[in-house]
Amino acid sequence: MSDYREIVYTEQGHVGVITIDRPDARNALTFTTYAELTDVVATSTARCLVVTGRDPAFCSGDDVKQIMTNAGSQVSSNLRAEPRLTPAAKALLETDVPVIAAVNGAAVGWGMELALMADIRVCSERAKFGELFVKRGLCCDVAGLARLTQLVGRESAAELLYTGRIIDASTAKQLRLVSRVVTHDELMPTTLALAHEIAGNPPLAVRRIKAGLRTALDPDFDELGRWVTTSLAELFQTADHREGVAAFLDKRAPHYVGR
């Protein structure tokens, strides 16, 4: 089992548990976190995976200081040179085993994308969800466009994406974004019980069912990923993106100019 710096991976029988482990940064994602998520999903031999975050957050999205400031121009260049579904998204969307998100706190930005890439979402009463990309002058990733719409319908998805609004666990349940809401103390026991129930079934049949759901419901994520990365490459270069990031870091209201 690999040693990781920003995630923790453990196995309980046939269930693998991935915990994002940057609590001081509210489990914000760095380039290292993305690489480790990609590796652990690709190399795990578990029959069911659980993804969660170390309290107090599930995942607060990209680490703005690393990914959206000084590194922003490099990210844009990389996306422009090779528009494709990002490796972490590809690993999560294409794994042949079920993935359950145990959402223990805020799941915003790519943290919400991560939750949406799971097959099932169980959340604590402390959970919050938000597709905040529009607030940074960006578009969301593939799960926000496809999976969110599958779960809550086009109209509710459009409202969440266009506004960047944050919703609580109760609202998420009403919208059918999550399968259930439990107390914070019950989150991991409930999620692990479900994961072990799934992992106890014949693995080949479970994998075939997952493949069938993907075939029946999902778009071509590779094609959608190319569209997303091409769009992000352009949006990373806009004044509105720079203003969205600066306003967030300065804790002030943004002023967008449409360019």
Task: Map each language-model feature to its residues.
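Helix-loop "lid/cap" segments that line or gate small-molecule binding pockets
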Residues: L160-L161, I198, G212-A216, T230-F236
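Charged catalytic carboxylate motif
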Residues: T32, E36, R84, A91, ...
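Conserved CoA-thioester-binding segment of acyl-CoA-metabolizing enzymes
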Residues: M1-R54
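Glycine- (often His-adjacent) and acidic-residue-rich active-site loop
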Residues: G53-A91, A107, G137, D220
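Crotonase-fold acyl-CoA enzyme core
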Residues: I7, K90-L204, Q237-T238, E243-A246, ...
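Hydrophobic alpha-helical core bundles mediating ligand binding, dimerization, or RNAP-core interactions
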Residues: E82-A89, A195, L213, G225-L232, ...
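Terminal peptide-recognition signature
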Residues: I18, R22, L37, V51, ...
